[in-house]
Amino acid sequence: MDTIRSYIAKARAFFAAHRAARIAGYILAAWLVFVLVFHPKGTKTFLLLGMDNYGSLNTVGRSDVMMLVQVDFTRADISTVTFARDMFIPDENGRKQKINTIVRQSGEEALVTAMENAFQVDIDGWFRVNFTTVIELVDAIGGVRIDLTEKEARYINRNTGDYEPLVEGKNHLNGDQALVFARCRQLDNDMGRGERQNKVMAAMVAQTKRMTIANVVSVFSSLKHAWVSSLSGFEQVRLLGNALWLRGAHVNSIGMPLGNWKYANSGVEIKMEENVQLLHEALGLPAPVFPDKK
């Protein structure tokens, strides 16, 4: 006990005699409090809806992107799941509907309810963005680096403005180019487009490691009109603060359907139980529970 008291007394004497050491100690203590109190923990899941229109977010177009975003703040890990927009799931009345039809006819909350019931996931909120959002945010963070095939590079060059031509391999895309890349399905199908959307999201997260102070200021300026959300203003501010801990986080990209499916009735019909099981495994969720068919 005397030894401990002696060490404490010596430490007090040292800090009393050295002003710089006292300041450094205060800063270290404040940083530790910040880490322990404000470092986000746990997992949140959000539904991201991308509309096929420019300008005001009050104008609701057709849903061009259906993406579930699971954020693990404890491990700094993000999983994105893109859903084929013409996939059939039961709506809130039990009728099979395409997911983009549900949101267009009944709104975001109805789609959240339908997806929670169909896939047995808890969704903490939704965000609606549009083409303008993607362009402005990608430009604000300084563009994104994406590996392109020769066909993808040619497609983007044909469908964007007078920019330096892109080539096969690693390219730096601006907002216009990233949007065209994310929307492209002419080269393959809706599943391919979903994979490209996941690549853009992963590239945006990776780019946060390289952002300058000017980029950060530009991002916060863009966020004033970036989306419409079910979250309150306070919840959005807190989420943005939490997102600072995710700079350069690992992104795991998934495309639904994961299991058996077929194209029928002008849409994607899936084997629900198999796909739900695979989705839960991919996201590290508890095993789903299905009704007894006996």
What are these model-predicted stretches?
Residues 2-294:
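Non-catalytic, solvent-exposed segments at the cell envelope interface
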